[in-house]
Amino acid sequence: DFSLSRGLGDVYKRQEKFLPKLIRGIKKEGINVVWSCDPMHGNTIKSTTGFKTRPFNDVVSEVKNVFAVHQAEGSYAGGLHVEMTGQDVTECTGGAKKISDADLSSRYHTHCDPRLNSDQAIELAFLISDEIKKNSLYSKSAIKAAS
């Protein structure tokens, strides 16, 4: 398992440098890896209200960007690490409920890192599903041909 925790800014800045070169190098060496994306840790910020948080839109953008890089390189994003809870917390900003910095204090229950709440986690799952459907590398015929 090869997990990348870059942060949105790094992924965008290095989209055409870091990750593609890494993918090409691993492929060239013939090493089999499972590429895993960690969009949480690199996108942790301090909110204007002083809470440690993660902007949901940055998490989503990083996931989409990682999928795009893998698509361009003929590779697969095979795993995703997210911190989430089934509780209705307000620890990460954004999402369908548009949690703002001002909302964070209402249900901020984490003892360590901010987690996606259940709605944000489901929203992310559907967005990932859409990315997989768009990506021809993940089609049944492509997977069958690769095996």
Provide a role label for each language-model segment.
Residues L137-S147:
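Basic/polar N-terminal segments that are highly enriched at the extreme N-terminus
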Residues D1-L8, Y12:
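Single conserved hydrophobic/aromatic residue that forms the stacking wall/gate
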